[in-house]
């Protein structure tokens, strides 16, 4: 069966792409340029991951969202939360709003659906997960179910989106990812890029943005060696 995986280059989308690789005979990956500050590093990561997985990587330009987005991911005004803030809903909600790109996931998944239908793929894999679903509404199970309902009417071949990590937090994702890496005989986790910033060097993370902090905590709490290089440990 043919499938596509939405691959930003981050840990969640990498693990999801490994699941897609395991479950399907042929996969392709799609990556999006929405004018994000970390674009170059994300593209580098996505291309490398795709090569290791033996998947063709397609990049779509949706940088027009910069015209109406005030997100820190586009402007560079990215907050550095405290570690204790990660489990504080009010503080996490503030961070979420500061990096929210209007309708980003809706736009990306709609394009991914069209691409999937065009190449006759039946599945779209996404890295939506439980931890981010707490604050990001477009990571929730409600979003997944609603989007799949729209696909029943919006595509002829009834493409369906799968989110294999929907019930996992970051610690569980890191654990699952390491198990998949070993099972598939790959050395690939080190190529993921989670940072909101472009730190000039490939795969180098700032260590202070929310995404980096959640990544660090995930590997540490899972008891797994973190393959990531951080500017600030």
UniProtKB/Swiss-Prot annotation:
<comment type="similarity">
    <text>Belongs to the QueC family.</text>
</comment>
<protein>
    <recommendedName>
        <fullName>7-cyano-7-deazaguanine synthase</fullName>
        <ecNumber>6.3.4.20</ecNumber>
    </recommendedName>
</protein>
<comment type="function">
    <text>Catalyzes the ATP-dependent conversion of 7-carboxy-7-deazaguanine (CDG) to 7-cyano-7-deazaguanine (preQ(0)).</text>
</comment>
<keyword id="KW-0547">Nucleotide-binding</keyword>
<dbReference type="Pfam" id="PF06508">
    <property type="entry name" value="QueC"/>
</dbReference>
<keyword id="KW-0862">Zinc</keyword>
<dbReference type="InterPro" id="IPR014729">
    <property type="entry name" value="Rossmann-like_a/b/a_fold"/>
</dbReference>
<keyword id="KW-0436">Ligase</keyword>
<comment type="pathway">
    <text>Purine metabolism; 7-cyano-7-deazaguanine biosynthesis.</text>
</comment>
<dbReference type="GO" id="GO:0016879">
    <property type="term" value="F:ligase activity, forming carbon-nitrogen bonds"/>
</dbReference>
<feature type="binding site">
    <location>
        <position position="212"/>
    </location>
    <ligand>
        <name>Zn(2+)</name>
    </ligand>
</feature>
<dbReference type="GO" id="GO:0008270">
    <property type="term" value="F:zinc ion binding"/>
</dbReference>
<dbReference type="GO" id="GO:0005524">
    <property type="term" value="F:ATP binding"/>
</dbReference>
<dbReference type="InterPro" id="IPR018317">
    <property type="entry name" value="QueC"/>
</dbReference>
<feature type="binding site">
    <location>
        <begin position="7"/>
        <end position="17"/>
    </location>
    <ligand>
        <name>ATP</name>
    </ligand>
</feature>
<keyword id="KW-0479">Metal-binding</keyword>
<feature type="binding site">
    <location>
        <position position="209"/>
    </location>
    <ligand>
        <name>Zn(2+)</name>
    </ligand>
</feature>
<keyword id="KW-0067">ATP-binding</keyword>
<feature type="binding site">
    <location>
        <position position="206"/>
    </location>
    <ligand>
        <name>Zn(2+)</name>
    </ligand>
</feature>
<feature type="binding site">
    <location>
        <position position="195"/>
    </location>
    <ligand>
        <name>Zn(2+)</name>
    </ligand>
</feature>
